[in-house]
Amino acid sequence: MKLSMITCTGTGTIGEYTVTKETTMKQIDTTQLDAAACQAQAAEYHARGFNCAQAVACTLAPAVGLDPQVAFTLTEGFGAGMGGMTETCGAISGAVAIMGFVMSDGMENPKTKGQTYKLSREIAKRFGEKNTTTVCGTLKGIGSDKGPLRSCPGCIDDAIEIACDVLKQLAE
């Protein structure tokens, strides 16, 4: 697979985080980041049996030059809150996996992870603000008399919307 690369320098603010773009970042095709279209694609994937992480990552993969099949296999264990443990929502994990792919310079330069962490925190922060939590079990209402706070399809929609916004900001 051939990846398109762009060299980015400078800084930008995404949410409360300043992201330093001094890395060779994967090219982001913003024409593939229409949130409504991405949400529809992710919903189709989820309806076919993809877990929440897979639905998000496979939907966003083409926009960043990642093979959706690779995204699918890499995120298989992140569903149902990390391997069924109902911890961090899989939809968030799928979005974070895409940010890692975009920002990482690879094994030769492991110093890019700090920038990826900032983007990961921004995604989790926005998701938590929208849903009051990032924990799968709490979102699903497991162990609660109140029922679910947000359905899996709703969580996928939210993660897609947030990730599309962050990716568009990175591409600016």
Residue spans of the language-model regions?
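Short, Lys/Arg-enriched N-terminal segments with co-localized hydrophobic residues
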Residues: 2, 12-24
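Phosphate-handling active-site elements
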Residues: 63-74, 101-119
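A short glycine/serine-rich beta->alpha loop
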Residues: 40-47, 78-86, 143-149
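Polybasic, low-complexity association/targeting segments
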Residues: 24-48
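Acidic-glycine-rich active-site phosphate/pyrophosphate-binding loop
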Residues: 26-32, 59-77, 130-137
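C-terminal binding/interaction regions
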Residues: 115-172
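DPxDG-like acidic metal-binding loop motif
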Residues: 94-102
